[in-house]
């Protein structure tokens, strides 16, 4: 009897031990299942993120959707966004041609203003000298031939001075403010051209074609300016020998002396 009771006690203890082990294993398996579920969910999310990552290649490509330029914020997630990017690239290159035209026009403005200032000052001084020479010529009508020749020489000298004022081709040095404006325009041109170069380095065929289109349109619009192919001549001849009408027909600049 004692032996049977001892066996029954041992069996009961074994049963309780197995029950505790099973409960512990079930308790440990619960966090593991939760962790595996979380890990699987993380893998799904990572797969979704990888599907919409930027496509960048250093070789020639035709990427449209998921293409990125200059920054991860410039991420084309649809064809409409990529079309807008292409239009923006075209406008950027057109803006570059516009800045170049503005730079040329500003340089021409500086030259015109400086030469007009010099012509005004020289013409004023020459007109005064020519007036004095004309008055002396009128008073020397009854004087000897030697005096008359001296007066005519002085009149011709004043006329040549007037002509030199109109044919002044000396280089013009900009002022400090004008040079600051020129440097600012050059900086803007350099910055826009640098961004265009960075866009071309993505080797996207559509973007490169848009750069070419923008260069064509910009040159067509902002390089459409008069071409000074004919040289302008200043001819210091008296009015009776070369009327002003003939000068205009020949495209020449004639100055009355």
From Swiss-Prot:
InterPro entries per the UniProt record, alphabetical: Cop_transporter
Keyword rRNA processing among UniProt keywords: no
Knockout consequences: Exhibits a reduced copper content and leads to cell decolorization due to lower laccase activity, when ctrA2 is also deleted.
Record-linked Pfam families: Ctr
Reported induction: Expression is up-regulated by copper deficiency and decreased dramatically when the copper concentration increases. Expression is up-regulated by the deletion of ctrA2.
GO MF term list: copper ion transmembrane transporter activity
Annotated localization: Cell membrane
Alphabetical UniProt keywords: Cell membrane, Copper, Copper transport, Ion transport, Membrane, Transmembrane, Transmembrane helix, Transport
Catalytic activity: Cu(2+)(in) = Cu(2+)(out)
TM annotation in the entry: 79-99, 202-222
Any Gene Ontology CC annotation: plasma membrane
Disulfide bond as UniProt keyword: no
Membrane disposition: Multi-pass membrane protein
Annotated function: High-affinity copper transporter of plasma membrane that mediates copper uptake under low copper conditions. The mechanism driving the transmembrane transport of copper has still to be determined. Acts as a potential virulence factor.
PANTHER family: COPPER TRANSPORT PROTEIN CTR3, SOLUTE CARRIER FAMILY 31 COPPER TRANSPORTERS
Family as reported in the entry's similarity comment: Belongs to the copper transporter (Ctr) (TC 1.A.56) family. SLC31A subfamily.
Protein name: High-affinity copper transporter ctrC
Natural source organism: Aspergillus fumigatus (strain ATCC MYA-4609 / CBS 101355 / FGSC A1100 / Af293) (Neosartorya fumigata)
């Amino acid at each position: 009897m004692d032996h049977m009771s001892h066996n029954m006690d041992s069996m009961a203890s074994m049963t309780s031990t197995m029950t505790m082990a099973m409960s512990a294993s079930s308790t440990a398996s619960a966090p593991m299942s939760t962790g595996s579920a979380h890990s699987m969910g993380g893998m799904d999310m990572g797969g979704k993120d990888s599907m919409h990552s930027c496509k960048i290649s250093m070789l020639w490509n035709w990427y449209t959707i998921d293409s990125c330029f200059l920054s991860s914020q410039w991420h084309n997630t649809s064809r409409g966004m990529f079309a807008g990017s292409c239009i923006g690239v075209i406008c950027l290159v057109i803006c570059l041609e516009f800045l170049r035209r503005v730079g040329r026009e500003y340089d021409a403005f500086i030259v015109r203003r400086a030469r007009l200032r010099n012509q005004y000052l020289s013409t004023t001084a020459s007109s005064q000298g020519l007036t004095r020479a004309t008055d002396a010529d009128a008073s020397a009508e009854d004087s000897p031939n030697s005096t008359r020749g001296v007066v005519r020489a002085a009149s011709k000298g004043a006329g040549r001075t007037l002509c030199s004022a109109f044919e002044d081709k000396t280089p013009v040095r900009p002022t400090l403010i004008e040079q600051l404006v020129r440097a600012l325009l050059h900086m803007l041109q350099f910055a826009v051209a640098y961004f265009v170069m960075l866009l071309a380095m993505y080797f996207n065929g559509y973007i490169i074609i848009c750069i070419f289109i923008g260069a064509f349109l910009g040159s067509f619009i902002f390089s459409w300016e008069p071409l000074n192919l004919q040289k302008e001549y200043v001819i210091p001849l008296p009015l009776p020998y070369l009327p002003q009408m003939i000068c205009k027909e020949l495209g020449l600049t004639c100055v009355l002396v």
